[in-house]
């Protein structure tokens, strides 16, 4: 029985070919990982546990270093056998030490803030050189265009304050003022007091 011929791999395309779309890679068998998935998971778990223990140990060392430093700076006072005057002197000394520590803390915080501001300024300078800033032009916008840009095209806001006012002509205004000014005459005419008022206003009209 004749042996079957193995299939030949596809020919590699040249870069000068019109249908070339990428670098040609020779076909090869898929590599199998030497470590199984369960073994990988076990190794990751061990690494995470080791990192957790290291972090806990570093935190304990940092806390111990802090306590040691505080013990050197502020040793526990010895109060046995001290009188009132000695206790007062000790209190004044502690208050002075607290003031000095507070001043040092403020100075240190100021230096840290200044350094952070300088670092931020340098970062902005470095980032500013990477981009080309476009030239800004001054554009004059009307009040309606500005409100439309802020509120959107759906909201139409008019800035004409006289739009909602009532328009009154000059002759109508004079008529209304004349009617308002003659309200006493209208009241007298309606009440029948107009003739009597003239009678009393005439000279000697009220004498019989």
Swiss-Prot record:
| InterPro entries associated with the record | Troponin (IPR001978), Troponin-I_N (IPR021666), Troponin_I (IPR050875), Troponin_sf (IPR038077)
Gene Ontology MF terms in the entry: actin binding
**Which residues does the annotated region (Involved in binding TNC) include?**
28-73
**Alphabetical keyword list:** Acetylation, Actin-binding, Muscle protein
Gene Ontology cellular-component annotations: troponin complex
Q: Which GO terms describe its biological process?
A: cardiac muscle contraction; skeletal muscle contraction
Q: Where is this region: Disordered?
A: 1-37, 54-74, 168-208
Residues recorded as bearing N-acetylalanine in the entry: 2
Basic and acidic residues composition bias: which ranges?
Answer: 54-71, 168-187
Q: Which family does it belong to?
A: Belongs to the troponin I family.
What is the recorded function of this protein according to its Swiss-Prot or TrEMBL entry? Answer: Troponin I is the inhibitory subunit of troponin, the thin filament regulatory complex which confers calcium-sensitivity to striated muscle actomyosin ATPase activity.
Subunit details for this protein? Answer: Binds to actin and tropomyosin.
Q: What is this protein called?
A: Troponin I, cardiac muscle
Naturally occurring in which organism (per UniProt): Coturnix japonica (Japanese quail)
């Amino acid at each position: 029985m004749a042996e079957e011929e193995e299939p030949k791999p596809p020919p590699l395309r040249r870069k000068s070919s019109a249908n070339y779309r990428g670098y040609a890679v020779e076909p090869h068998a898929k590599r199998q990982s030497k470590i199984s998935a369960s073994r990988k998971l076990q190794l990751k778990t061990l690494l995470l546990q080791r990192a957790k223990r290291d972090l806990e140990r570093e935190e304990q060392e940092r806390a111990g270093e802090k306590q040691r430093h505080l013990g050197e700076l502020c040793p526990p006072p010895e109060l046995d056998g001290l009188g009132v005057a000695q206790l007062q002197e000790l209190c004044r000394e502690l208050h002075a030490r607290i003031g000095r520590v507070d001043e040092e803390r403020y100075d240190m915080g100021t230096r840290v803030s200044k350094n952070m501001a300088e670092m931020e300024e340098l970062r902005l300078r470095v980032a500013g050189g990477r981009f080309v800033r476009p030239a800004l032009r001054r554009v004059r916008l009307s009040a309606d265009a500005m409100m439309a840009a802020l509120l959107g095209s759906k909201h139409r806001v008019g800035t004409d304050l006289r739009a909602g006012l009532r328009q009154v002509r000059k002759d109508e205004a004079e008529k209304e003022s004349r009617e308002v000014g003659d309200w006493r005459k209208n009241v007298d005419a309606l009440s029948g007091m107009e003739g009597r008022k003239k009678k009393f206003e005439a000279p000697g009209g009220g004498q019989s």
